[in-house]
């Protein structure tokens, strides 16, 4: 291993260690107040109320930003995440290139499914604590829950589903998000479409897309 490789490895390890500790320190004060104290604070401070609803917790910088822009200005700013600089996440991408890798690149970089699974879970926590695109991260979490795909089946497919389906369409049209999810290898594998055929169709995805993703259990349709 040459000196540059060693330097990069140490830098990466140092970054991950520091980032992990920083993430924990950031997450601990997010629930600093009891429900009663928080409700009282929000009642007297509408800006804090908005921050607590749109973000993962009122950080000092968030409160400064909403006071600078005003409530409407802050919401408008958060609705355009592509225009918000996010240096903490840029550093994360530099430390973990697998997060932006293609399918085949990711397979080469991370051959241990559980190791990549851990990284994806840790990354979600890190983004929640450090990203400036807080509303975007909240919406990503909502759609991730709605179009649920377990991380344990295949972490690489989950990585691509998160990036190319959920994050790409999080603030876009639901129709486009639904179609992207319907073509996601992670979703198709999870709901057994990899074993579905014309002669022996598997109805798992069809049932889930009707009951959970769109119309609901009593949505005015039958299984006939």
Predicted regions and their residues:
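C-terminal segment of N-terminal export signals and the immediately downstream linker at the start
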Residues: 30-57
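N-terminal secretory signal peptides
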Residues: 1-11, 21-30, 34-35
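Asp/Glu-centered strand-loop micro-motifs enriched in Gly/Pro and often flanked by an aromatic residue
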Residues: 3-6, 35-41, 61-65, 105-131, ...
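Primarily short, surface-exposed interaction patches in extracytoplasmic proteins
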Residues: 61-66, 119-224
């Amino acid at each position: 291993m040459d000196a540059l490789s060693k330097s990069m490895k140490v830098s990466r390890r140092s970054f991950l260690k520091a980032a992990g500790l920083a993430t924990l320190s950031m997450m601990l004060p997010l629930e600093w107040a009891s429900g009663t104290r928080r409700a009282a604070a929000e009642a007297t401070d509408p800006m804090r109320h908005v921050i607590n609803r749109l973000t993962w917790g009122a950080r000092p910088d968030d409160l400064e930003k909403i006071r600078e822009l005003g409530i409407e200005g802050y919401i408008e700013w958060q609705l355009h995440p592509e225009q918000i600089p996010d240096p903490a996440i840029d550093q994360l991408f530099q430390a973990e290139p697998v997060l932006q890798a293609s399918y085949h690149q990711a397979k080469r970089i991370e051959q241990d499914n559980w190791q990549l699974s851990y990284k994806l879970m840790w990354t979600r926590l890190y983004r929640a604590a450090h990203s400036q695109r807080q509303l975007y991260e909240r919406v990503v979490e909502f759609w991730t829950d709605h179009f649920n795909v377990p991380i344990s089946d295949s972490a690489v497919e989950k990585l691509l589903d998160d990036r190319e389906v959920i994050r790409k369409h999080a603030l876009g049209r639901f129709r486009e998000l639904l179609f992207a999810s319907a073509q996601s290898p992670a979703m198709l594998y999870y709901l057994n479409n990899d074993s579905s055929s014309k002669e022996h169709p598997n109805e798992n995805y069809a049932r889930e897309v009707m009951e959970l993703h769109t119309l609901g259990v009593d949505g005015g349709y039958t299984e006939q």
